[in-house]
Design a protein with these regions (language model features):
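HIT superfamily nucleotide-processing domains
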Residues: 21-163
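A cross-taxon signal for low-complexity, glycine/charged-rich
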Residues: 1-3, 7, 16-18
Length: 163
């Protein structure tokens, strides 16, 4: 039914998946929260999430942000989107672990300061400055070396999108 809120636009999932993610065709354009925009570098889009690198060289730190304006909590996504989110978390976390050869992955959805749903995927090493504590507030953000961060992003893109 064209023109009604029940009209849907279909987005294909990751290759090999038969399910689809639907979003109302009259949904407003998605936008990234201004704080996340300021603090990150865009890597690219998966079917549901934008993948970003946090601008802090202290830790290999990624964000996944579902492209749903209304989502503040994971429970704000429908069941198909929640399943897709888990698929994308796994794919990105696996890539991060392979690229960094980290000891541990920290995965969290906090959102106390930024109300847009986003998930942190952080590679941790027992030798990092915050180990074993959480990374928040331990050290001031350290700017990335431009060449190093581009190499990191290229390696992540190969692992995430090419496997």
């Amino acid at each position: 039914m064209a023109g009604t809120s029940s009209a849907k636009t279909r987005f294909a999932l990751l290759p090999g998946h038969d399910e689809e993610i639907c979003m109302p065709s009259d949904a407003p354009a998605w936008s990234l929260h201004s704080q996340l925009k300021k603090d990150t570098i865009d890597i690219g889009d998966l079917p549901l999430c934008r993948v970003l690198v946090i601008k802090d060289a202290n830790f290999p730190w990624l964000l996944l942000v579902p492209r749903r304006n209304e989502a503040v909590e994971i429970i704000d996504l429908d069941e198909v989107e929640q399943a897709q989110l888990m698929t994308e978390i796994s794919r990105v976390a696996r890539a991060l672990k392979e690229v960094t050869r980290c000891d541990k992955l920290n995965i969290a959805a906090l959102g106390n300061l930024v109300p847009q749903l986003h998930l942190h995927v952080i590679a941790r090493r027992s030798s990092d400055v915050a180990w074993p504590r959480p990374v928040w507030g331990v050290m001031p953000a350290l700017a990335h070396d431009a060449e190093e961060v581009q190499n990191f992003i290229s390696a992540l893109r190969r692992k995430i999108w090419l496997g």
